[in-house]
């Protein structure tokens, strides 16, 4: 009798025998979301068990939302836009910070060099400059040319990118000239755009202007042309008129 019982127990705990003796049913039609959505009645044992899973899902969703918001804010202060994925945002931010650190060290070295230079070596030479021999008319022409070039917004690059959720990113790169930042702000204000946020950064003799605008994807090309036209119209108003009297 004991041999029969031992044999039955041995067969029962074998994996194949165990699965055959136990009645397991798995309904493949159960959706994963239903299993963890927490839609069960909280008063039932199943509902009580699913409540922590539901809280975990909400917590994870909130965490990702906060992360996306922080990446969005980081993207708004980084001037160089390459791609909109998370890895590119972080990579661009690191490159931008490294560039700023390099410029900081460079400026600090120049300041130390100026502070260590004796004042006597900074005195002007008594030799006449060749520019003094240039006729007055030519000098006036140069001043006019210089004045007109510094008063214009010289755009090096203009990008308009659709980010989704009715958000368009405009990135303008310009040469750094007198009051260029103020002029760019005046241009964008004159266009009556729905600006969400904007950022202006000066780096290595250039100005990077990043603007987030509320617009649909279909407006991307129209928006780009509108900005180009606005900058061109502003430059035309800033170009000085040349007169004979101004040469003397």
From Swiss-Prot:
Gene3D superfamilies: Helix-loop-helix DNA-binding domain
Domain of life: Eukaryota
Composition bias, Low complexity: 37-54
GO molecular function: DNA binding; protein dimerization activity
InterPro entries listed in its UniProt record: bHLH-TF_ACT-like_plant, bHLH_dom, HLH_DNA-bd_sf, TF_AMS/ICE1/BHLH6-like
Subcellular location per the Swiss-Prot or TrEMBL entry: Nucleus
Domain (bHLH): residue spans on this chain: 51-100
Record region (Disordered): 37-60
A cellular-component GO term for this protein: nucleus
Keyword field: DNA-binding, Nucleus, Transcription, Transcription regulation
Reported tissue expression: Expressed constitutively in roots, leaves, stems, and flowers.
One Gene Ontology term from the biological process aspect of the record: regulation of DNA-templated transcription
Major subcellular site: nucleus
Subunit structure: Homodimer.
Name under which the protein is recorded: Transcription factor bHLH35
Provenance organism: Arabidopsis thaliana (Mouse-ear cress)
Gene: BHLH35
